[in-house]
């Protein structure tokens, strides 16, 4: 019963911060059981690949090897478990869900390039190693959306469709009022204390799911420990504009679904207007009373919208 009650909440918390070591062993062990339960429910197995750079990339994969590959890319501060819950609703596709370099259980080198093109190149190496680089569907949330755009722009002939969920990288649309004046010293996405983490949890989601404070504290410490790398990555991505690369998506007429929560405080919903201007073929869905992570806040609706989009590609 505990697993069912806390599954989504603990899963999201993990997706925002990762999970390695923490001071509260009981909380960590309990959360790991919850996460493993969710992965098992979605038929996901965790695997890893050593990249040409020598870095390790960890990823989750389901067992639907006959489905068309769908590469799902998490956002800043996240990891593969951002998509574990919704993976249960996307069982008709061959899911590949990585921890990006710098996040989750993948390597975290301080000297790496974490901009969209560099991350896209690493993901393409993963897909090539698995023999799945051709006829790929790609989707991403927030920073993962910007990386999805970069991936499609670098390898347009290999991409069958694109799914952008509250995507970053279209910076000329401006920032929401909630982030006006934010710097690396006061950005709510960078965690200096447990209190910062609690505020971030409520900031990112419009209706955050319940999670015990003791578990939050464990993950807060992880974010505190990772702050130096998080700061470096955030500094790189906030200046990494993908709008020119998005024009390649328009040029190749890659089918694109754009999904946004109308209560997103991290990246303004009006960004959809700019994306539609740059990528005219894009379909846009605005979700009511949803924040920055629709695939966590509105799992069923987000999955159904995506499946309808994919079904439309067959017509």
Curated annotation (Swiss-Prot):
Alphabetical list of Pfam families matching this protein: Abhydrolase_1
AB hydrolase-1 domain boundaries: 69-296
Top-level lineage group: Bacteria
EC number: 3.1.1.3
GO-annotated cellular components: plasma membrane
Signal peptide: 1-18
Lipidation (N-palmitoyl cysteine): 19
GO molecular function: monoacylglycerol lipase activity; triacylglycerol lipase activity
Thermal dependence, as annotated: Active at temperatures close to 0 degree Celsius.
SUPFAM superfamilies assigned: alpha/beta-Hydrolases (SSF53474)
Key words of the record: Cell membrane, Hydrolase, Lipid degradation, Lipid metabolism, Lipoprotein, Membrane, Palmitate, Signal
Primary localization: membrane
Protein localization: Cell membrane
Catalytic activity: a triacylglycerol + H2O = a diacylglycerol + a fatty acid + H(+)
Top-level EC class: hydrolase
Gene3D superfamilies named among the record's database cross-references: alpha/beta hydrolase
Lipidation (S-diacylglycerol cysteine): 19
Bilayer topology: Lipid-anchor
Catalytic center residues: 74, 142 (charge relay system)
Family: Belongs to the lipase/esterase LIP3/BchO family.
Protein name, UniProt field: Lipase 3
Species of provenance: Moraxella sp. (strain TA144)
Gene this chain is encoded by: lip3
